[in-house]
C-alpha cells in the first residue's frame, strides 16, 4: 500500500466499515427496544405486506368471534325464555287434565281456571317482553319473529349464518291467541279443548319444543364456529409474529457483536489516521 499525504485509503476503508457497523448496531438496538424485527417497510417490504394482510385477517376473525358470542347470547336469551314457557305449558297441561276429573267441585275448577289464565297471560308476557340489548326477540316484529337474523361469523362478507325461527314463533303466538287457550278451563268442554291444543301433535308443547330445537342447533353450530375461529386466529397471529417479531436472542447477539466491532473499528481508525504523519517522518 502506497504511503500518501492526500489519500488515506486505510482510514477510508475503516470509516466505511464503521458506518456499516453503526447501522447494524442501530438496527439491533431498535429491534430490541421495539420488540419488532420489521419497524419500517425498508426492513422487509414483502414481509410487511404479508404481515399487514395477516393482521387484517386476524382482526376480522377476532371481531367475528365476538359476533358469534353475541349471537349465542342472543339465542340463549330466546331459548331460555322458551324453556320457561315450556315449564309453564307443562303446568297448564296439568291443570287442564286435572280439571277434567269428575271429583272437582265448581270452586275447584274456578281456582284451576284462574291459575290457567294467569299462566296463559305470563306466556304472552314472555313472548312480548323477552329482549336482548334493547331488541325484543319474540314479540310481533321482534328480532326472531320478524324473519331471519343474520350473524356475521367470518372475516369476509360471505361468511354469515342466517337463523330463521320466525315461522315457529308465529305458530306459538297464534296458538296462544287461540280461543282454546284464552277461554280457560272453566268447564269440561273448555278444559278438553285446551288440553288438545296444548298436548296434541302440533300443539303448544310441540311448537315451543320445535322452536327451542332450532335455537339449540344454531347455538351448537356457533360454538363450533368460535372454536374454529379461535384456531385460525391463533395460527394467523403466530404466522404474523414470525414475520414481525424480533428474536431477542439473535438481536442481543448482534448488538454485542457490533458493539465490539465498533470499539475495535474506532481503535483502528485512530491508528490509520496516523499514517499521513508517517510520510512526514521520511522528510526528517
Curated annotation (Swiss-Prot):
- Tell me how this protein assembles: Homomer.
Principal place of residence: secreted
Highest taxon of the source?
Bacteria
SUPFAM superfamilies membership: Phase 1 flagellin
Q: InterPro entries of this UniProt entry?
A: Flagellin, Flagellin_C, Flagellin_C_sub2, Flagellin_N, lat_flg_LafA
Coiled coil, from the record: none
GO molecular function terms noted in the UniProt entry? structural molecule activity
Q: What else is known?
A: V.parahaemolyticus possesses two flagellar systems: a single polar flagellum propels the bacterium in liquid (swimming), while multiple lateral (peritrichous) flagella move the bacterium over surfaces (swarming). The polar flagellum is synthesized constitutively but lateral flagella are produced only under conditions in which the polar flagellum is not functional. The peritrichous flagella are unsheathed and powered by the proton motive force.
Please provide, in alphabetical order, the Gene Ontology terms of the cellular component aspect for this entry: bacterial-type flagellum; extracellular region
Secreted found in the keyword field: yes
Q: What does this protein do?
A: Flagellin is the subunit protein which polymerizes to form the filaments of bacterial flagella. Essential for lateral flagellar synthesis and swarming motility.
Identification of the protein by name: Lateral flagellin
Q: Which gene encodes it?
A: lafA
Sorted alphabetically, the keyword list is: Bacterial flagellum, Secreted
Keyword RNA-binding in the entry? The reply is no
Signal peptide range: none
- Return the similarity comment: Belongs to the bacterial flagellin family.
Q: What is the lineage of its organism?
A: Bacteria, Pseudomonadati, Pseudomonadota, Gammaproteobacteria, Vibrionales
Q: Where in the cell is it found?
A: Secreted; Bacterial flagellum
Amino acid at each position: 500500500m502506497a504511503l500518501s499525504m492526500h489519500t488515506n485509503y486505510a482510514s477510508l476503508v475503516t470509516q466505511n466499515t464503521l458506518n456499516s457497523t453503526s447501522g447494524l448496531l442501530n438496527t439491533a438496538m431498535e429491534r430490541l427496544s421495539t420488540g419488532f424485527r420489521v419497524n419500517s417497510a425498508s426492513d422487509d417490504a414483502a414481509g410487511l405486506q404479508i404481515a399487514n394482510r395477516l393482521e387484517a385477517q386476524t382482526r376480522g376473525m377476532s371481531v367475528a368471534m365476538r359476533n358469534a358470542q353475541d349471537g349465542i347470547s342472543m339465542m340463549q336469551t330466546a331459548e331460555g325464555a322458551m324453556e320457561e314457557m315450556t315449564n309453564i305449558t307443562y303446568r297448564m297441561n296439568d291443570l287442564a287434565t286435572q280439571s277434567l276429573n269428575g271429583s272437582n267441585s265448581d270452586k275447584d275448577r274456578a281456582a284451576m281456571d284462574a291459575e290457567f289464565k294467569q299462566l296463559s297471560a305470563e306466556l304472552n308476557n314472555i313472548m312480548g317482553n323477552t329482549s336482548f340489548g334493547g331488541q325484543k326477540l319474540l314479540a310481533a316484529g321482534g328480532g326472531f319473529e320478524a324473519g331471519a337474523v343474520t350473524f356475521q361469523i367470518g372475516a369476509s362478507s360471505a361468511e354469515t349464518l342466517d337463523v330463521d325461527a320466525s315461522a315457529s314463533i308465529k305458530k306459538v303466538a297464534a296458538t296462544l291467541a287461540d280461543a282454546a287457550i284464552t277461554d280457560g278451563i272453566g268447564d269440561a268442554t273448555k278444559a278438553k279443548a285446551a288440553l288438545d291444543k296444548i298436548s296434541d301433535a302440533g300443539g303448544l308443547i310441540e311448537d315451543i319444543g320445535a322452536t327451542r330445537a332450532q335455537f339449540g342447533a344454531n347455538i351448537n353450530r356457533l360454538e363450533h364456529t368460535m372454536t374454529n375461529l379461535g384456531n385460525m386466529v391463533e395460527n394467523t397471529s403466530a404466522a404474523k409474529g414470525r414475520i414481525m417479531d424480533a428474536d431477542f436472542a439473535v438481536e442481543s447477539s448482534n448488538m454485542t457483536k457490533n458493539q465490539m466491532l465498533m470499539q475495535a473499528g474506532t481503535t483502528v481508525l485512530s491508528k490509520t489516521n496516523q499514517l499521513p504523519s508517517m510520510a512526514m517522518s521520511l522528510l526528517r
